[in-house]
């Protein structure tokens, strides 16, 4: 057997059909595109159109809404705070708030405030001022000898709401 003897199995490769080449070819005139009109033209597809069948986006019910007054808090866990204190990124003796967390690079931005979450363990005695905290986070900070002060969240202006 030689390399030149190798061939595909019969019928495994189908010849490409050249369309629109006369009625005798069997694929002339409309070239398999149905009738005339928008769908017979090149590059045109009607988004979401399912051939007259009720499209999926209209079969499903409308649901929910976007609350323009929703506040988006930056979240920080206790283990991340402890890492920052251990690495001396933040000073544990002072008050830790949104400004100090952003200035030290622990958070990228404070968004509408900071929310303290309870993942991990906290050993350092910290004074924390945040806009929200979970029960477990508050308990863990107080167990370590620190305090948590919950600030009132900054209200969004009506013009600022997006």
From Swiss-Prot:
Subunit-level organization: Part of the 50S ribosomal subunit.
Record-linked PROSITE patterns: RIBOSOMAL_L15 (PS00475)
Molecular function per GO: rRNA binding; structural constituent of ribosome
Recorded superkingdom: Bacteria
Ribosomal protein recorded as keyword: yes
Alphabetized Pfam families for the sequence: Ribosomal_L27A
One GO biological process term: translation
Residues of the signal peptide: none
PANTHER family (alphabetical): 50S RIBOSOMAL PROTEIN L15 (PTHR12934), LARGE RIBOSOMAL SUBUNIT PROTEIN UL15M (PTHR12934:SF11)
Name of the protein in question: Large ribosomal subunit protein uL15
Family: Belongs to the universal ribosomal protein uL15 family.
Gene symbol of the encoding locus: rplO
Compositionally biased spans, kind Gly residues: 21-37
Any Gene Ontology CC annotation: cytosolic large ribosomal subunit
Segments of this protein annotated with the region Disordered: 1-41
Its job: Binds to the 23S rRNA.
Keyword entries, A-Z: Ribonucleoprotein, Ribosomal protein, RNA-binding, rRNA-binding
